[in-house]
Amino acid sequence: MAAPGALLVMGVSGSGKSTVGALLASELGWKFYDADDYHPEENRRKMGKGIPLNDQDRIPWLCNLHDILLRDVASGQRVVLACSALKKTYRDILTQGKDGVALKCEESGKEAKQAEMQLLVVHLSGSFEVISGRLLKREGHFMPPELLQSQFETLEPPAAPENFIQISVDKNVSEIIATIMETLKMK
């Protein structure tokens, strides 16, 4: 596989996606997006009330993120995206657009899209106990710790043929960044 045009830092809430993604983008000199910043207000309210999002909530949000990634990568900008992307279908939407879902992504059907976006998925994984402990310490986030169990239930960890690496959140942030950088050197 060619070097990725984009990196997806994924995992459940509290896995460190935003922290790792922002530091990684800074280290690489790539553009950084935090998918949480693109949730519609309705999604934020729903999660704030402790109601898990369903596919109908997530698909328009993922399509929007796909369109942003596609525009940047097509213009030569390399990107790091921090996004839960819990299901393979969600990761497919990020790389391929609306294929396989009932909703059309704005950019997906345009002729400028020559091929599937080259994406390296970085799955930050950890136990429920470790991650729930992190969430309990976090302040000011719209995602309440009570929704973590539903995220673990929804999670479909990446598997072949996806282009991915899995890194334990038991490592410190600098070890995680070093592992990702080493992986990129091999691509």
Curated annotation (Swiss-Prot):
Pathway: Carbohydrate acid metabolism; D-gluconate degradation. GO terms for biological process: carbohydrate metabolic process. CDD domains: GntK. Its EC number is 2.7.1.12. Pfam families: SKI. It catalyses: D-gluconate + ATP = 6-phospho-D-gluconate + ADP + H(+). The keyword tRNA-binding does not apply. This is Probable gluconokinase. It comes from Homo sapiens (Human). The gene is IDNK.
